[in-house]
């Protein structure tokens, strides 16, 4: 809050009354006089013109705007269909059984070194939270008790999260490394296979997943 020092207030009062010196205004006739009105206006103008002499605090705000990542999705990875072979239902008679793994990859392009290192993929499908397979969404004649599961191609067979809650950052070991500061093409390798949720019945199987490139 702006504060007016007492000495400066007194000085303003002294200067504002100088023009009324020698006048005969006093007592009750002073409060309604022209001199009184001039006195009051001069004092107010003097106080308003005074600079602020006290600062009680300060708040500094800081932030940052970052650019979008440089990576783009390779054309043949952007919208693709992975076809799994036909299998007999006997191969998927128990919950948790898998069959017919098919490899596929998603490749990024035009990444700078920093983005290639931070890039990961976030998969989302029509699944419930924590579900580690894509539900069968075939429109007609679909097989029951079976879905599609995406797993890592690193030999562990670990399923990829497909509910949009956790991204996968594991890239193929021969990609995504700095190459003399040139553009880099990191590749994400996977397998897709049938996944039984019970004794599978005969029919069509179809599932769709979307993915986003994230940087962290």
Swiss-Prot record:
Specify the species. Answer: Haemophilus influenzae
> Lipidated positions for N-palmitoyl cysteine?
20
What does this chain do? Answer: May be a minor structural protein required for pilus biogenesis.
Q: Which gene encodes it?
A: hifD
On whether Repressor is a keyword of this UniProt record, the answer is: no
Position of the signal peptide: 1-19
Q: Which InterPro entries match?
A: Adhesion_dom_fimbrial, Adhesion_dom_fimbrial_sf, Adhesion_dom_sf, Bact_Fimbrial_Adh_Pro
Covalently attached lipid (S-diacylglycerol cysteine), positions: 20
Protein keywords:
Cell membrane, Fimbrium, Lipoprotein, Membrane, Palmitate, Signal
Name where it's found.
Cell membrane; Fimbrium
Which Cys pairs does UniProt list as disulfide-bonded?
Answer: none
Q: Return the similarity comment.
A: Belongs to the fimbrial protein family.
Q: Does the keyword Ribonucleoprotein apply?
A: no
Give an example GO biological process: cell adhesion involved in single-species biofilm formation
Q: What protein does this entry describe?
A: Minor fimbrial subunit HifD
Renumbered residue ranges of the record's region Disordered: 159-180
Q: Which domain of life is it from?
A: Bacteria
